[in-house]
């Protein structure tokens, strides 16, 4: 009988979330490096170079890979022979306490994005709790935890469909991907859940994104069953769409396709598609009663030695000095290198600011965005003047 301490769960979750905030999984880094060397589109190649360089800088400086540090999803497999040292907290509460400690860590505070009352006032909880926790009781005497932090851009592109049993899943994915735009920040992965019921398909899709990237190994050895054939079919179809890195066109839109299935009703074929962005963040660990998880940092030497030089079609902009006349000279297709102070806000913030200004209401007292830049996903707003 194994005794698991609640503090080991809390500490392990907190450490894991800090860890994945600045360490890309190495399988993703390696897959992206291969895609970089294969890429023929210069714009897409530049985008992948910047992702890889940013990844290394994040690992070196222990700073977040992306400013959207995500909502936490946790899959917890609890062995039937496990005992807890304390029963004053549920597993959900243990995970939430770990999330709270990770996101309020003074050495590397992470952005809190979780809101209460989603259909009403949408009040930020300030510490990114609660997490979404899936608990499964399994044989054994350990606790296995898979934990991820997923940003809103990719999560918002989730697609769900109830297909007819005879419908072609690969064809549906191929038709669906172009409707998702580039807001899910490719290149990434696709997680596909098939079967069960509607909600089961969604959980399967999310859980599949926790798996190791191995599509190249599958290509080399060939598929051994229908599920692997479907993975390869979707992988090839999606990459032939030419969406490419950050939607700039190119050979690689996804570095892997994952599929998990479950038995389903004879009349049904539920399918859920969840993309993972280039800020892929997840880690797995097992608690066996000997203490908290020991997460070994990767070595910086494991990142590729890739550099990126600004090309001729590049404009350098100091945001402290730029004028409206300067902005009007920017051209579609240019690479703009920004320096200076920039504010970040989600689409909802952008919409609210625009609505206040257009209605004549104005901004709240003490809030003045004039002359400042606000980054909103792919849109940059020069407050009170123009959107470019």
Which functions belong to the PLM regions below?
Residues 37, 56, 60-62, 71, ...:
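Metallocofactor- and cofactor-centric catalytic cores in central/energy metabolism, strongly enriched
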Residues 76, 149, 319, 340, ...:
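Pocket-edge structural micro-motifs
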Residues 177, 323-324, 360-363:
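A generic local structural motif
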Residues 356-377:
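Short peripheral tails and domain-boundary helices/loops at the edges of structured domains
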Residues 380-388:
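Single conserved hydrophobic/aromatic residue that forms the stacking wall/gate
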């Amino acid at each position: 009988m194994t005794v698991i301490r609640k503090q080991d769960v809390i500490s392990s979750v907190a450490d894991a979330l800090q860890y994945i905030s600045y360490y890309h999984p190495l399988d993703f880094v390696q897959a992206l490096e291969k895609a970089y060397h294969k890429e023929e589109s210069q714009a897409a190649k530049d985008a992948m170079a910047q992702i890889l360089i940013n990844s290394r800088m994040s690992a070196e400086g222990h700073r977040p890979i992306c400013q959207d540090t995500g909502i936490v999803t946790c899959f917890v497999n609890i062995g039937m022979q496990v005992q807890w040292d304390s029963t004053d907290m549920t597993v959900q509460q243990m995970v939430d306490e770990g999330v709270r400690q990770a996101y309020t860590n003074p050495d590397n505070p992470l952005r809190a994005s979780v809101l209460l009352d989603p259909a009403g006032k949408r009040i930020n909880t300030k510490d990114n709790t609660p997490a979404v926790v899936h608990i499964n009781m399994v044989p054994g005497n350990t606790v296995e935890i898979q934990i991820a932090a997923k940003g809103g851009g990719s999560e918002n592109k989730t697609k769900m469909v109830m297909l007819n049993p005879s419908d072609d899943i690969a064809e549906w994915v191929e038709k669906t991907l172009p409707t998702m735009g580039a807001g899910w920040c490719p290149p990434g992965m696709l997680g596909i859940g098939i079967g069960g019921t509607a909600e089961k398909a969604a959980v399967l899709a999310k859980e599949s994104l926790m798996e190791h990237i191995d599509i190249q190994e599958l290509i080399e050895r060939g598929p051994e069953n229908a599920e692997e054939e479907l993975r390869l079919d979707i992988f090839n179809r999606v990459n032939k769409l030419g969406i490419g890195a950050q939607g700039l066109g190119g050979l690689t839109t996804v570095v892997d396709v994952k599929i998990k299935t479950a038995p389903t009703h004879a009349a049904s074929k539920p399918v859920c598609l969840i993309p993972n962005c280039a800020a892929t963040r997840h880690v797995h660990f097992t608690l066996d009663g000997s203490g908290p998880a020991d997460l070994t940092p990767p070595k910086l030497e494991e990142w590729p030695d890739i550099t990126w030089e600004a090309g001729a079609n590049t404009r350098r902009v100091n945001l402290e000095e730029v004028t409206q006349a300067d902005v009007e000279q920017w051209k579609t297709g240019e690479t703009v290198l920004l320096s200076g102070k920039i504010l970040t806000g989600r689409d909802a913030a952008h919409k609210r600011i625009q609505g206040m200004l257009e209605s004549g209401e104005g901004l709240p007292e003490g809030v003045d965005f004039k002359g400042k830049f606000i980054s909103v996903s792919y849109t940059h707003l020069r407050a009170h003047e123009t959107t470019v």
